[in-house]
């Protein structure tokens, strides 16, 4: 049987656990993703959106607008000229928001160790899940979404909003 926290601060017993679980369930099962494909990993992300992998069963819907997205999926090489635009897209997303870094180039800069390449998306925006590989298979991306769902279910409903960083 689940344990419930009872809050007597208002004078009446109020059960808080049920509301947290309901909000966590809703957030984890309706992930609206901003697909942000920058290189060859985007091809695998497009394949993941097809009927063979059926991401709809996880409640994942791909959106073109950051204002309608909770999850940003960065797939591919991020150049330094593009970093400010990426940060602006991240800032336009409503809270709470999560980021998945997909592929070796997004995770660490990949084989492009040059002056023009950002050596990891986490230098620009906070990343929640890293998907390794060059290019990672849609199954790996699917597994990353399942890990993100588990992470969301463990968070408090009243998650603190991180302060905005300047680029």
From Swiss-Prot:
Gene3D superfamilies cross-referenced by the UniProt entry: 3.40.50.12280
Cofactor note: Binds 1 [4Fe-4S] cluster.
One of the protein's GO biological processes: aerobic respiration
Disulphides: none
A Gene Ontology cellular-component term: plasma membrane
Topology within the bilayer: Peripheral membrane protein
Enzyme type, top EC level: translocase
Required co-factors: [4Fe-4S] cluster
Catalysed reactions, as listed in the record: a quinone + NADH + 5 H(+)(in) = a quinol + NAD(+) + 4 H(+)(out)
MF-aspect GO terms: 4 iron, 4 sulfur cluster binding; iron ion binding; NADH dehydrogenase (ubiquinone) activity; NADH:ubiquinone reductase (non-electrogenic) activity; quinone binding
InterPro entries: NADH_UbQ_OxRdtase-like_20kDa, NADH_UQ_OxRdtase_20Kd_su
Subunit structure: NDH-1 is composed of 14 different subunits. Subunits NuoB, C, D, E, F, and G constitute the peripheral sector of the complex.
UniProt similarity note: Belongs to the complex I 20 kDa subunit family.
Protein name in the entry: NADH-quinone oxidoreductase subunit B
Organism for this UniProt entry: Campylobacter jejuni subsp. doylei (strain ATCC BAA-1458 / RM4099 / 269.97)
Originating gene: nuoB
């Amino acid at each position: 049987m689940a344990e419930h926290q009872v809050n007597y601060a208002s004078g009446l017993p109020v059960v808080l656990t049920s509301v947290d679980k309901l909000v966590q369930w809703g957030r984890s099962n309706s992930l609206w993703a901003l697909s942000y494909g920058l290189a060859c990993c985007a091809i695998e992300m497009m394949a993941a959106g097809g009927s063979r992998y059926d991401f709809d069963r996880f409640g994942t819907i791909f959106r073109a607008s950051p204002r309608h997205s909770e999850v940003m999926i960065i797939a591919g090489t991020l150049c330094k000229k593009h970093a400010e635009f990426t940060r602006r897209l991240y800032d336009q997303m409503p809270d709470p928001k999560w980021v998945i870094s997909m592929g070796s180039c997004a995770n660490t800069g990949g084989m492009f160790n040059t002056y023009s390449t950002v050596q990891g998306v986490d230098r620009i925006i906070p990343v929640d899940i890293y998907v390794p590989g060059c290019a990672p298979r849609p199954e790996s991306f699917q597994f990353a979404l399942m890990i993100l769902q588990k992470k969301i279910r463990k968070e408090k409903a009243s998650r603190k909003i991180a302060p905005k960083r300047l680029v």
